[in-house]
């Protein structure tokens, strides 16, 4: 299971500098050595520790926590909301989620997921598909309806008021993310700001934020970062926190 923290230091820096947030980028046990629920157990333990210790350790407000993640890390950013202490009306409820090409439906193996028309016919990552399924496959039958494994199943009441999905168009994860957004927003009905927003980068691919700038220019990557930081700032202001760098 990927979505590893080492690749996201630049985004972490932007969030810290532009929002004033205390940013904690956590690691977790990975597959194939550690399958579900190892990673989400580690993420849950991290959130619980932060709720109990972040204020004393760093002066951070445990009642204004948001989560974020890339790829498999996006799965965990969603799945931690299934803890009661991360849901309203708990004061420590997660206030927003921002994810980038998040894996939110493990009910299907990667090769079973719908492939967009613009996916390359000879996918260079095809050889790795069994590895991509190593986290979920051993637990799939038993946990088929478990939102800790497949957050696409989350009830809207368990989710925060603001969610951003950055969805590149050249990716097998497009359908699960767009269908999730449509379901939650339809269940919400009319709102001033939709709960789930999508930034759809139709000509980009899974992992594009983590490749060198010579492959994907930094200004293109910054469209996703800028939108995520906007959502975080708006969430902070809603709860009376503003940052003047």
Summary of predicted features, one role per range:
Residues 1-245:
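Alpha/beta-hydrolase superfamily serine-hydrolase fold, recognizing
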